[in-house]
Amino acid sequence: MIYPQTMLTVADNTGAKKIMCIRVLGGNRKYGKIGDTIIGVVKEAIPNMPIKKSDVVRAIIVRTSKTIRRADGMYIRFDDNAAVIVNMENNPRGTRVFGPVAREIRDKNFSKIVSLAPEVL
């Protein structure tokens, strides 16, 4: 569950290292799950990269440390909360995605993120 003020690691090579969620998009939602879009502010960034500290960005949640239950009864949980920074068309701004992503990303039609990911769980 990703609430406003939650810190997430960035799982791509855009230059941002950590973002803080400031809004979960989609109506009057209190928290975000895997596959949801959030608005975040960059809190840590690598120098001389396209995304700078204090930039406001859109991101897709790809990993959460909260256990989620799948339709087949299996439970899955990750070690961290992570997101991939996207543009307004929901295409990733980076060219690489680090770490595994959940299968729910594919179900929500973020196929470009899935194709860049090294592993889909």
UniProtKB/Swiss-Prot annotation:
Q: Which SMART domains does the entry link to?
A: Ribosomal_L14
| Listed SUPFAM superfamilies | Ribosomal protein L14
Q: Which residues form a coiled coil?
A: none
GO CC terms for this protein?
A: chloroplast; mitochondrial large ribosomal subunit
Q: In Gene Ontology terms, what is one molecular function of this protein?
A: large ribosomal subunit rRNA binding
Q: Which GO terms describe its biological process?
A: translation
Q: What is the purpose of this protein?
A: Binds to 23S rRNA.
- Complex formation: Part of the 50S ribosomal subunit.
| Protein family membership | Belongs to the universal ribosomal protein uL14 family.
Task: State the protein's name.
Answer: Large ribosomal subunit protein uL14c
Look up and give the organism this protein is from.
Thalassiosira pseudonana
Gene name linked to the record: rpl14
